[in-house]
Curated annotation (Swiss-Prot):
Cu(2+) 3 binds at residues 62-64. It comes from Lophocebus aterrimus. Keywords: Amyloid, Cell membrane, Copper, Disulfide bond, Glycoprotein, Golgi apparatus, GPI-anchor, Lipoprotein, Membrane, Metal-binding, Prion, Repeat, Signal, Zinc. Cu(2+) 1 binds at residues 47-48. A lipid is attached at residue 215 (GPI-anchor amidated serine). Residues 44-76 are annotated as: 4 X 8 AA tandem repeats of P-H-G-G-G-W-G-Q. GO terms for biological process: protein homooligomerization. Glycans are attached at residues 166, 182. This is Major prion protein. PANTHER family: DOPPEL PRION, MAJOR PRION PROTEIN. It is found in: Cell membrane; Golgi apparatus. Belongs to the prion family. The lineage of its organism: Eukaryota, Metazoa, Chordata, Craniata, Vertebrata. GO terms for cellular component: Golgi apparatus; plasma membrane; side of membrane.
Length: 238
């Protein structure tokens, strides 16, 4: 009995001193981030999760958000200086908007000329049947809009019309020739008559609008009107 007791006691002591076999998260692990001394195929990690070289989230090399290489926002290379900024819209003054709406669209590259609204081509008689028939058959080839400058840049109607006719025929001829169509002397003669009538109509329209704008400015700038407007504002605010 004494011998059996001693043998059993020795076996229990040896069991307590015997090391445990390797397992999950123990020495000899092949997975990263354990810091074990034996058999690790990956370099020791700095406290991050799986695949985190420097303590970031999953797949984050330097501690940024998901898919962020250097800690910036989405698509940002590492700081606010690389952020994409939406370009600000250009400011348009009310004065320019009002002028464009009243006078027509300014044409780029023509030195301040504006393009008038489309008009119906006038019915013109040229004094003989051949030219009258030719005009009726070819009038669609002639301009139905004119180029012009503001009326306040001219001293009289004749100067406005002369400039309007020249620039309109020149632009229409260049544009049409580029498309492969040429004009005869008869075409040029008829275009001059047609465009002249349209330029006169445009001058009358622009002159009327110009004087109406001037009258409105004079009306609202008179002292009685200013006093009345100020009184109404005082009543509304008060």
């Amino acid at each position: 009995m004494l011998v059996l007791f001693v043998a059993t006691w020795s076996d229990l002591g040896l069991c307590k001193k015997r090391p445990k076999p390797g397992g999950w998260n123990t020495g000899g692990s092949r997975y990263p981030g354990q810091g074990s001394p034996g058999g690790n195929r990956y370099p020791p990690q700095g406290g991050g999760g799986w695949g985190q070289p420097h303590g970031g989230g999953w797949g984050q090399p330097h501690g940024g958000g998901w898919g962020q290489p250097h800690g910036g926002g989405w698509g940002q290379g590492g700081g606010t200086h690389n952020q994409w900024h939406k370009p600000s819209k250009p400011k348009t003054s009310m004065k320019h908007m009002a002028g464009a709406a009243a006078a027509g669209a300014v044409v780029g590259g023509l030195g301040g000329y504006m393009l008038g609204s489309a008009m119906s081509r006038p019915l013109i008689h040229f004094g003989n049947d051949y030219e009258d028939r030719y005009y009726r058959e070819n009038m669609y080839r002639y301009p139905n809009q004119v180029y012009y400058r503001p009326v306040d840049q001219y001293s009289n109607q004749n100067n406005f019309v002369h400039d309007c006719v020249n620039i309109t025929i020149k632009q229409h001829t260049v544009t049409t020739t580029t498309k492969g169509e040429n004009f005869t002397e008869t075409d040029v003669k008829m275009m001059e008559r047609v465009v002249e009538q349209m330029c006169i109509t445009q001058y009358e329209k622009e002159s009327q609008a110009y004087y109406q704008r001037g009258s409105s400015m004079v009306l609202f700038s008179s002292p009685p009107v200013i006093l009345l407007i100020s009184f109404l504002i005082f009543l509304i605010v008060g």
